[in-house]
A protein has these predicted regions:
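N-terminal signal peptide c-region/cleavage motif recognized by signal peptidases
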Residues: 13-18
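Short, flexible, mixed-charge glycine/proline-rich loop motifs
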Residues: 20-24
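Detector for the c-type heme attachment site
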Residues: 34-39, 94-95
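Gly/Gly-Pro-rich "capping" loops immediately C-terminal to redox-active cysteine motifs
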Residues: 38-66, 75-79
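The canonical Cys-X-X-Cys-His
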Residues: 28-36, 89
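C-terminal capping alpha-helices of c-type cytochrome domains
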Residues: 69, 78-98
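Sec-dependent signal peptide recognition
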Residues: 1-7
Length: 98
């Protein structure tokens, strides 16, 4: 019984790990402006994403995508992501230390 429970626990962790990998891979495209792991120098013209609340990041990305938040280039970038990808990005950046 313990082996079965342990196997179920290990298998249940895989979707989370897969989302972490997907978020990290998607976030690589953000590094050019938002810095590696979402950290930027203090004088950067963009905000650091590391450690921001997941819901805030996802809401802002979706607002860029639907055009309700003004932007220079983010509205075009955000259109390339679906809800699941935005959620994975948001979770990954939220998990990074500031």
């Amino acid at each position: 019984m313990k082996v079965l429970f342990l196997a179920a626990a290990v298998l249940a962790a895989f979707p989370v790990a897969a989302q972490d990998v997907q978020g990290r891979n998607l976030a690589a495209a953000c590094a050019i402006c938002h810095g590696t792991e979402g950290r930027v120098p203090a004088n950067a013209p963009v905000i650091p994403l590391a450690g921001l609340p997941k819901d805030h990041i996802a809401t802002q990305m979706k607002a860029f995508r639907d055009g309700s938040r003004p932007a220079t280039v983010m509205h075009q970038i955000a259109k390339g992501y679906n809800d699941q990808q935005i959620d994975a990005l948001a979770a990954w950046f939220a998990a990074q230390k500031r």
